């Protein structure tokens, strides 16, 4: 979006209004989830042990819409596909209503990232709704990951769920001659001992009451979140107010970073934008420091010759979701911190959401190290949501 133009329409619309223009099912779901929970908060759960991760997700889950993980820094990560850490996180996501974002930052040739994403020990695609990629390896890796996700989705095994009911038929079930014939056949195959009657007819023969056995079979993906086999006792609850997340998988492109001295320049960011627009069925949006919807090459990299042209129509159609890390609130009455001394540059929710135009603020240590993490998560949720409301009011 050129600085001389009006703000992109996506900045003026509510999350609910943006659902209709979303090309990705998971993006549509996330927009609706944000409205239901009145939250645009992501927790960066950078803890060191699996027990801490699961406990934190359970405590903070009610306040967030996204949980960001780094599985490879977690001690004690259990890789079992049905009872391991990923499966338990998925159960908590269903219970509290949030999506899991594995901050893997894939960057390699296509065949390698496909295997890293869908195979290996972690099998990220199985439990993480969202992951991300650094596209220094080129746009082809994004297409490769999209193909891998689609193949995974198509080959999810289907499980047969069988229910058996036994009952005594009532009179109106046998209103016609055909039904009577069916009863005669059932009398031949239903064991007498299953009968509920011990009465005898006047001629000395046992009376016979037919029991009909009904077998119903339904088919459901074996990895469907609706199946309870992967969740622990007591975690069967599903967040009310919205259906469970779709099984589709999504990608965030790492377009910009907040670390001091970051080498991701305007040319790189423009290549990210092009890759996102070419892969809308898989790319949900960006991890970025500004809103990139409607952005043009001249906005990001004036004079850059990439041999391609971008149309205004393409730019206007953008409806990508944006997430931004480095969000930090000062203690009440104090000034906002500028950074952590290790290269991380902090921003308040108002600066990120209202001014810079991100959709979801990512918070880590600001919540994790607080004396009361759930209360602090609520403080961040309220601030980030107000920043979103202020943005809409400001740009109306």
Swiss-Prot record:
Keywords: Decarboxylase, Lyase, Pyrimidine biosynthesis. Gene3D superfamilies: Aldolase class I (3.20.20.70). Pathway: Pyrimidine metabolism; UMP biosynthesis via de novo pathway; UMP from orotate: step 2/2. Its EC number is 4.1.1.23. GO terms for biological process: 'de novo' pyrimidine nucleobase biosynthetic process; 'de novo' UMP biosynthetic process. SMART domains: OMPdecase (SM00934). Pfam families: OMPdecase. It catalyses: orotidine 5'-phosphate + H(+) = UMP + CO2. Substrate binds at residues 46, 68-70, 103-112, 346, 365. GO terms for cellular component: cytosol. It is an enzyme of class 4 (lyase). The active site is at 105 (proton donor). GO terms for molecular function: orotidine-5'-phosphate decarboxylase activity. It comes from the Eukaryota. PANTHER family: OROTIDINE 5'-PHOSPHATE DECARBOXYLASE. Belongs to the OMP decarboxylase family. This is Orotidine 5'-phosphate decarboxylase. It comes from Sordaria macrospora (strain ATCC MYA-333 / DSM 997 / K(L3346) / K-hell).
């Amino acid at each position: 979006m050129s600085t001389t133009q009006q703000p992109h329409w996506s900045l003026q619309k509510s999350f609910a209004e943006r659902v209709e223009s979303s090309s990705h099912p998971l993006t549509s779901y996330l927009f609706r989830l944000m409205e239901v929970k009145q939250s645009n908060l992501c927790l960066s759960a950078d803890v060191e042990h699996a027990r801490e991760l699961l406990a934190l997700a359970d405590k903070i889950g009610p306040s967030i819409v996204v949980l960001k993980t780094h599985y490879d820094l977690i001690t004690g990560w259990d890789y079992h596909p049905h009872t391991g850490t990923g499966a338990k996180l998925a159960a908590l996501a269903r219970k509290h209503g949030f999506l899991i974002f594995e901050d893997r930052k894939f960057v390699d040739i296509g065949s390698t990232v496909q295997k890293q994403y869908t195979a290996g020990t972690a099998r990220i695609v199985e439990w993480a709704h969202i992951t991300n990629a650094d596209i220094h390896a080129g746009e082809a890796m994004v297409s490769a990951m999209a193909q891998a996700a689609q193949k995974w989705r198509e080959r999810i095994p289907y499980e047969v769920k069988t229910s058996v009911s036994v009952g005594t038929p009532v009179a109106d079930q046998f209103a016609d001659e055909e039904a009577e014939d069916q009863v005669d056949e059932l009398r031949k195959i239903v064991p007498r001992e299953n009968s509920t009657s011990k009465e005898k007819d006047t001629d000395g023969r046992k009376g016979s009451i037919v029991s009909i056995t009904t077998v119903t079979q339904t088919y459901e993906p074996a990895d469907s979140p609706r199946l309870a086999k992967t969740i622990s006792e007591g975690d069967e609850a599903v967040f009310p107010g919205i259906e469970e997340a779709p099984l589709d998988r999504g990608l965030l492109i790492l377009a910009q970073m907040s670390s001091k001295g970051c080498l991701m320049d305007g040319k790189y960011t423009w290549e990210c934008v092009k890759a996102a627009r070419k892969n809308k069925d898989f790319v949900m949006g960006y991890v970025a420091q500004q809103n990139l919807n409607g952005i043009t090459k001249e906005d990001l990299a004036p004079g850059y010759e990439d041999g391609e042209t971008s149309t205004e129509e393409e730019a206007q159609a953008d409806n990508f979701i944006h997430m931004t890390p480095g969000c930090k609130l000062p203690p009440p009455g104090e000034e906002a911190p500028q950074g952590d001394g290790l290269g991380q540059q902090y921003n308040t929710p108002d600066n990120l959401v209202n001014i810079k135009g991100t959709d979801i603020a990512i918070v880590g240590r600001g919540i994790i190290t607080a004396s009361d993490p759930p209360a602090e998560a609520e403080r961040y949720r309220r601030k980030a949501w107000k920043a979103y409301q202020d943005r809409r009011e400001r740009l109306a």
